Amino acid sequence: MKKDTSELKIHYKSLKKEIKQRLRQFSALPAPDYFYELCFCLLTPQSNAKKCWQAVEKLKKCRLEGRKINSRRIKSCLRQNTRFYRKKAKYIKEAVKKWHLIKEKITKIKDAAELRNWLADKDNVKGLGYKEASHFLRNIGKSQNKAAILDRHILRNLKRYGVVREIPNLNKKNYLLIEKKMIDFSIKLGIPLDELDLLLWAKETGNVFK
């Protein structure tokens, strides 16, 4: 069933300038900061995004790149700010080890869908699924309006607006199917996918963040 989207369009009009500014900030992110955006996206599952960013700020002070990896130090940065910090510390440790390869792929693979597929492969980056890989690409300005971040805020709104009937388990097949529906929805609204994601997130949380 189609739902009225007039209120959403009004909300977009009020936030459009801020949303576009945030996306410009993502696109202008210096390459050395990509690593910490990856850390952020590894931390966010089942955790508060702003608290996760506080943990990332602590990680930045540790300057993990190029250093001997100190698991205890990583855990201490995460403990107060994210759930399942022990497991996520392991993911970050692995990301440090593989960062040279990850950087190379970000540079070489120009298509967002292809790059996300590589990032979401657990043999390449542990702890990243399709949602987290999409989030990472958006936050470094490389999602090309092709990668939906299907978190609980977005999924609730897609159901609310009749884009999906129910919220299924997000295996790869279902993720790509719902993503296609969200892209079609964004086209009908006249709102680019990356902007729609930030709009729906702001609608749920009250602010345009990451």
Model segments located where?
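C-terminal accessory module of base-excision DNA glycosylases/AP lyases that mediates lesion recognition
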Residues: 1-28, 89, 106-117, 124-210
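Structure-specific DNA junction-binding interface
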Residues: 1-62, 68-76, 80-82, 209
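Conserved aromatic-histidine-acidic binding/catalytic patches
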Residues: 31, 40, 44-47, 80, ...
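Alpha-helical ds-nucleic-acid-binding substructure associated with the helix-hairpin-helix region
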Residues: 56-126
